[in-house]
């Protein structure tokens, strides 16, 4: 069988994206973001995001095909994010993808957006070794997964019990007065600060809680501790050392993620850790994981920044895996699932 060509379409949140992947080669990748429209509200407004998807869908898909010098007739299948995500946003992408699949008589795969973050690393690093672990870190998810077969079988090793890592950063960013999205601002300030200036807790790493939840994550306590420290400093009339706050927060979160990921690798005998999701663009986390991975003899695969955030390439790459593995395409009338479980790879 020749290398399958898949058109991937993404619309789970505030990015409308389309890409064409052939085998393990990225042919085209187009992203249109509505982030600027949400910035003044301090977060994503679902109705605005849905309308932006409707406006950007056709231009994105058209450009992705044009950049690949292809038409719909050239692709072997269409893959689209069916969940998890914002229901209205998912509906736009899925309905558009279904229309294309029907018009061109192509098979369609409604895929799990989060698992796409795992699959996309194949574009940069190639196939997954046996017993690969994946750390997914984003605004909505912080999970450790065992990848037995990215097209057929994934197990959840650990997940967040409250706030995800990206969510924690966004909330602290608001306290510091940073505009949305706050994560990149914390990242930049953290590079200038002292990571040991402020004592920030490391949730679920010690005592009974750490033993009961060795691979789970909790960042609500981190957010609360930093918030209280800031409030105390303000009450005492002290100037907030923003760089140090950001550095201490980033170091605490990165340390927890790296420690639990390495513990998982040891448990499963994995020598490869895949990292994905928008938060994996954080420079402190990338450095910490590479450092700890080298000490433990674990190859850490973190994709380039443009493949960390939401994109169509990740959707198309997972679609390629599904086609190659002979997974049955989704039914034409499959539904979106805004709370799609991580163990469900496709509809």
UniProtKB/Swiss-Prot annotation:
The gene is tsaD. The keyword Cytoplasm applies. NCBIfam families: gcp_kae1 (TIGR00329), T6A_TsaD_YgjD (TIGR03723). Its EC number is 2.3.1.234. It is an enzyme of class 2 (transferase). It catalyses: L-threonylcarbamoyladenylate + adenosine(37) in tRNA = N(6)-L-threonylcarbamoyladenosine(37) in tRNA + AMP + H(+). Its main location: cytoplasm. Belongs to the KAE1 / TsaD family. It is found in: Cytoplasm. Required for the formation of a threonylcarbamoyl group on adenosine at position 37 (t(6)A37) in tRNAs that read codons beginning with adenine. Is involved in the transfer of the threonylcarbamoyl moiety of threonylcarbamoyl-AMP (TC-AMP) to the N6 group of A37, together with TsaE and TsaB. TsaD likely plays a direct catalytic role in this reaction. Pfam families: TsaD (PF00814). One of its GO terms (biological process) is tRNA threonylcarbamoyladenosine modification. The lineage of its organism: Bacteria, Bacillati, Actinomycetota, Actinomycetes, Bifidobacteriales. HAMAP family: TsaD. Its cofactor is Fe(2+). It comes from the Bacteria. This is tRNA N6-adenosine threonylcarbamoyltransferase. PANTHER family: TRNA N6-ADENOSINE THREONYLCARBAMOYLTRANSFERASE, TRNA N6-ADENOSINE THREONYLCARBAMOYLTRANSFERASE, MITOCHONDRIAL. Substrate binds at residues 136-140, 170, 183, 187, 282. Binds 1 Fe(2+) ion per subunit. Fe cation binds at residues 113, 117, 310. Keywords: Acyltransferase, Cytoplasm, Iron, Metal-binding, Transferase, tRNA processing. One of its GO terms (cellular component) is cytoplasm. It comes from Bifidobacterium adolescentis (strain ATCC 15703 / DSM 20083 / NCTC 11814 / E194a). One of its GO terms (molecular function) is N(6)-L-threonylcarbamoyladenine synthase activity.
């Amino acid at each position: 069988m020749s290398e399958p060509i898949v058109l991937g379409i993404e619309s789970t949140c505030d990015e409308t994206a389309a890409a064409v992947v052939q085998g393990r080669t990225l042919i085209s990748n187009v992203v249109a973001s509505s982030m600027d429209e949400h910035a003044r509200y301090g977060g994503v407004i679902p109705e605005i995001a849905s309308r932006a998807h409707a406006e950007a869908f056709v231009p994105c898909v058209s450009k992705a095909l044009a950049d690949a010098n292809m038409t719909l007739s050239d692709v072997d299948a269409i893959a689209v994010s069916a969940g998890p995500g914002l229901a209205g946003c998912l509906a736009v992408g899925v309905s558009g993808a279904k229309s294309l699949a029907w018009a061109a008589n192509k098979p369609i795969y409604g895929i799990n957006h989060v698992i796409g973050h795992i699959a996309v690393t194949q574009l940069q690093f190639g196939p997954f070794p046996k017993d690969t672990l994946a750390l997914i870190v984003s605004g909505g998810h912080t999970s450790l997964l065992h990848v037995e077969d990215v097209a057929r079988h994934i197990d959840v090793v650990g997940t967040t019990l409250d706030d995800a890592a990206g969510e924690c950063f966004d909330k602290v960013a608001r306290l510091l007065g940073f505009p949305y999205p706050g994560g990149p601002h914390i990242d930049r300030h953290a590079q200038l600060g002292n990571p040991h200036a402020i004592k920030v807790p490391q949730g679920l790493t010690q005592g009974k809680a750490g033993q009961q939840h060795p691979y789970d994550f909790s960042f609500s306590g981190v957010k609360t501790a930093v918030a209280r420290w800031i409030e105390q400093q303000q009450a005492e009339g002290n100037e907030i050392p923003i760089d140090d706050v950001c550095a201490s927060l980033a170091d605490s979160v990165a340390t927890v993620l790296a420690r639990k990921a390495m513990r998982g690798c040891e448990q499963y005998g994995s020598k490869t850790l895949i990292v994905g999701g928008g938060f994996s663009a954080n420079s402190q986390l990338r450095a910490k994981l590479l450092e700890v991975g080298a000490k433990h003899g674990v190859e850490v695969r973190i994709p380039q920044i443009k493949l960390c955030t939401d994109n169509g390439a990740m959707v198309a790459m997972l679609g390629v895996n599904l086609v190659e593995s002979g997974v049955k395409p989704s039914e034409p009338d499959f539904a979106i699932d805004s709370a799609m479980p991580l163990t469900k790879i496709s509809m």
